[in-house]
Regions:
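Short arginine-rich
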Residues: 60-72
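Short aromatic-glycine-(Arg/Gly/Cys) micro-motifs in beta-strand/loop hairpins
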Residues: 17-42
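Acidic helix/loop or adjacent segment enriched in Glu/Asp that either coordinates divalent metal
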Residues: 49-63
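A short, exposed loop/beta-hairpin motif centered on an aromatic-Gly-Thr core
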Residues: 38-53
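Short N-terminal "domain-start" leader segments
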Residues: 1-25
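Short, highly charged C-terminal tails/helix-capping segments
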Residues: 71-81
């Protein structure tokens, strides 16, 4: 699992098995006390055969985050996610 700290947020990779497919996510939490985690599915057109593959894809997505906006949305260095 890859994790990165930004000025007001922390982001990390996440994955989930749904049926026979795994999905990749970027999880984001504000550093404000009591903030909730939000999950953003990445590579939404792709399904992965295993959770490990989904984590690898999510790790890549986390590494490409430029910043996180005020609504806890990640801004990536590429536009297809």
């Amino acid at each position: 699992m890859r994790q990165r700290a930004f000025s007001n947020h922390i982001a990390w990779s996440a994955a989930q098995l749904k049926g026979d497919r795994a999905l990749a996510y970027v999880a984001i939490r504000s550093t404000d006390p009591g903030a909730k985690v939000t999950y953003h599915q990445v590579f939404i057109k792709n399904f992965f055969a295993s959770v490990d593959e989904a984590y690898s894809a999510a790790d890549e997505a986390v590494s490409r985050i430029i910043t996180i906006d005020a609504r806890s949305n990640p801004i990536f260095s590429f536009s297809d996610h």
